[in-house]
Amino acid sequence: KHKLFEQAEQAVINFDDSSAAAMIEGTKSVVTTYSIRQDGADFTAKNVRDLPDCVEYELVGSGMIGRVHLGIPGHFSVYNSMGALLCAMKAGVPFQQALGALRAAKGVKGRIEVVPTNTDYTVIIDYAHSPDGLENILSSLREIAHGRILCVFGCGGDRDRTKRPKMGS
């Protein structure tokens, strides 16, 4: 990953990534870091709330505090939104404008897509089509689930048939 930063003037790095130290050490870029778990980062997510249909948190850093409400559930969305917001700021987008864009962001159909049911359970569609992808989505759902997770998945189409037994195990 650190090869991405060898020629960059600016670098936005997830401080919680196991490769963060190597990426920071291997760059001459101006580095901005972000984290959910570590206070040593330039920006941190505080008071993270994983809800069935969204994620909320406070972004704190460089004398700025902003409340983020993102209609894409899961902890991975916190990381993705922090990285996107900081990259936008590096490109000159004002902090409050970048926050507003995150609030308006919608997920992609078929990727952790919440289906309204007006019931006491939540239905989520995700187009995970590999063993790793299925494992990641189920891990993300475990973070926000308040009960059982029932998983129905298919392996149709022209996808690699050798993945199917691994996905079912």
Predicted feature descriptions by range:
Residues I13, I125, F153:
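Active-site flanking residues adjacent to catalytic metal/cofactor-binding acidic residues
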Residues D16, A128, G156:
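Anionic group-transfer/hydrolysis microenvironments
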Residues V108-G110, D132-S169:
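Active-site beta-alpha connecting loops in nucleotide-dependent enzymes
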Residues T122-H129:
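Switch II (G3) loop of P-loop NTPases
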